[in-house]
Structure formats: C-alpha cells, structure tokens
Amino acid sequence: MTQQSPYSAAVAEQRHQEWLRFVALLQQAYAEDLHLPLLQLMLTPDEREALGTRVRIIEELLRGEMSQRELKNELGAGIATITRGSNSLKSAPVELRQWLEQTLLNDK
C-alpha cells in the first residue's frame, strides 16, 4: 500500500476546496438567474453534452429496462462511462437515489 505524501494530500484538499467554491458560485448563480450563462462560460459544448448523457445514463439505470450494453448502443456512450455511472449510483446516498427516481422518472 502506498501512502499519500503531504503534498498530495494538500493538493487533494485544495482541489476539494475549489470544487466547493464552484458549487457555491453555481448556487449563487441559480439564486440570481445566471446559471445558464455561467455554465456556458465554464463548460465546453462537449462537456455540456457529456453531462446530458450522464443524466440519461442515470435515468435509464434507475428505470432498469435496458442492459448496460443496450444503453451503450442507445446513447453512444462508452461501456466504462456507463459502468462508472452504475457504480456511482450504487454508492449514492439513499436520499439522493430516491430524489433522482422521483425527479427523473416521475416527471415524464
């Protein structure tokens, strides 16, 4: 087993703080109805498309009607991306999973 150096831990903490800063900025942008321009500024068209695909992956995994291979073919996403989504969903807090089910599956 390898140990993280203090530098690695410090870098990881800095990145975590930067992530939290972005989340706070996004919350403020939503409160001021500036979320779309902010996201267009911060994300490339490919990144925005990838996020949309990830939402579809989570939605279809929650629905449970397609295999991961069928989902790969339907969405044109890599099997590794779908597997990561599946693994993330399995480890998600119950409250988040319930909210996602209600939001993504019951709103259609």
Curated annotation (Swiss-Prot):
Isomerase found in the keyword field: no
Keyword annotations from UniProtKB, A to Z: Cytoplasm, DNA-binding, Repressor, Transcription, Transcription regulation
Subcellular location: Cytoplasm
Disulphide bond pairs: none
SUPFAM superfamilies (UniProt xref): TrpR-like (SSF48295)
UniProt GO cellular component terms: cytoplasm
Gene Ontology MF, one: DNA-binding transcription factor activity
InterPro entries associated with the record: Trp_repress, Trp_repress_bac, Trp_repressor/repl_initiator, TrpR-like_sf
DNA-binding region (UniProt annotation): 68-91
One of the protein's GO biological processes: negative regulation of DNA-templated transcription
Function, in words: This protein is an aporepressor. When complexed with L-tryptophan it binds the operator region of the trp operon (5'-ACTAGT-'3') and prevents the initiation of transcription. The complex also regulates trp repressor biosynthesis by binding to its regulatory region.
Subunit structure: Homodimer.
Family, as annotated: Belongs to the TrpR family.
Protein name, entry field: Trp operon repressor
Source species: Klebsiella aerogenes (Enterobacter aerogenes)
The gene coding this protein: trpR
